Amino acid sequence: MTTKRKPYVRGMQPNWWTKLGFYRFYITREGTCLPQLWFSLVVLFGVFALKNGPESWAGFVGFLSNPIVMLINIVTLIATVFHTATWFKLAPKAVNIVVKDEKLPQEPIVRGLWGLTIVVTVVILAVALIV
């Protein structure tokens, strides 16, 4: 048996996610993809500038020295650190590591991830300064 009545569809406001802190946090975290897109485009532009010779590279460096670009890059760095911190807090929840019949606490995993990040960053900076 079918009916000709329309089913009730509850209205959804465009700002529904602002009412709960969890959703605001989630949308903010997922919104960090926009600064990551900026960073990816800047790196891609830099690679092509490097490929096209010294004049092109000088133009790219000039572009990076623009105060607005510096501000956008600082915002991108902050967004990246925020995204990394939240990701490192989520990672132990997805991994179930058992040591001697006990689940490994989250803190050693998070500390290990931050330690690895610091080591890799120092190695990359050292290589960049040596070469």
Curated annotation (Swiss-Prot):
The gene is frdC. GO terms for molecular function: succinate dehydrogenase activity. It is found in: Cell inner membrane. InterPro entries: Fumarate_red_C, SQR/QFR_C/D. Part of an enzyme complex containing four subunits: a flavoprotein (FrdA), an iron-sulfur protein (FrdB), and two hydrophobic anchor proteins (FrdC and FrdD). This is Fumarate reductase subunit C. The chain crosses the membrane at residues 30-50, 58-78, 109-129. Belongs to the FrdC family. GO terms for cellular component: fumarate reductase complex; plasma membrane. It is a multi-pass membrane protein. It comes from Proteus mirabilis (strain HI4320).
